[in-house]
């Protein structure tokens, strides 16, 4: 499923530049020919055998030969039928390819969109082309979604074709050898290893049932010795799911990857994914508890479970790690499979994604949007909670800058859909991954955002989220399904190294922070609609008189804060409120 993170330039080019229908139709024709030859061979073999036994060859030897030959005639007929089925499946694959080709956007249309975007960006000196750039990006996202939907459809159709192909029948001689081996070891059934087993796939001795591991177990999936029941682990247990020894009843093995919140739902499951390089050794309770702080305000009761994703980004997570694109693609596969499994079980699903897994959630939203309405989950069945989202429409670093690094396997992924499913998107102020400045020429804002990535996003400074102080940010329409919340940062990440200096570090940082915050905030537009993708601009519209007044107020506040930090009374009472 790598195509889920590949841009339309790649997906469209691949489907249009491929070999086409020819090889698949040729394969279908070849399988048809093989089926005809096998049918003819079976008929000829049966005819010769019948002729011999019906004319000159009679007696016990003739009867024995007839009995020996009959299974081979059946094998030839079965193989002929399987070859004919393979021919039909090849034609189905060709039809699926033809439908995919028709549904995929042509490379010429993709190139036209990219050319138009490049022209708009080049001429966007004063930001006047921002609406047109956003429209071009929106069109590009639609093209991306259409290509991904076509490729997912092709993947599903091709997978269905492949799974319907039956393996070639095992030879009669091998079947006979398997039966003789089972009888010689005193086993009755198939796949047993040991002596005296009755059933299938038992490993040990004197087991009765299926999939037991040990000795003298009766039941299904028991591990240990002399258990009676299903799924017991230990010895001498009678019941279901017991862990221990000599117990009777029902048990539930402890699951270190599950956290029950509130009343546990019921029927509400939270799938919790970590960020880049967060594939921690189990258990993952700290991650589940962290996610619970953000999920619980909307869902007071649910059962949270850790969903494993690769969480890798070559070369930052190691020279042997997966590239970002491959890691995200595998994560999308894991997430989609888990969502469908929970929905099939009748559960409502909440997806929690942070950092890289927020990008995984973005791709899953897009894929679900591309499906017909009757095939995708309802708005009351699925919701998302995101933090540290690099695809946030206004502020996400992957949305601010439309760049890809093919050498590192890193492809632009665009903005998270705002109208796919009910979503709460939390952004930490000054974390450059989800709150990157709109005007990066502001060196104070950009340096502070980079420091935010280093100190806040990486977790080097563990700050508990203060959800009560979160600011709900504006959106373009009340019908938008996503709620955007900004969690304020009391201190600027850029001043973290200064605060590390003993004794004088904090007072000096407190002295300059209010004025520095004024300069940093000039790099942001806090009034922008958060659901509208916002690429970077060059120069903000600034009221310099207001900036001068804010700097004057900040200077007073800085002196008050510095003296307060030293335990001295401030010269101006009362202290002015902090700037946001």
Swiss-Prot record:
Top-level taxon: Bacteria
GO biological process per UniProt: response to host immune response
Domain PE-PPE, chain residue ranges per copy: 300-525
UniProt cross-references to Gene3D superfamilies, sorted A to Z: alpha/beta hydrolase, PPE superfamily
InterPro entries in UniProt: AB_hydrolase_fold (IPR029058), PE-PPE_C (IPR013228), PPE_dom (IPR000030), PPE_sf (IPR038332)
Pfam family, one: PE-PPE
Similarity annotation: Belongs to the mycobacterial PPE family.
Protein name per the record: Uncharacterized PPE family protein PPE42
Organism for this UniProt entry: Mycobacterium tuberculosis (strain CDC 1551 / Oshkosh)
Protein's gene: PPE42
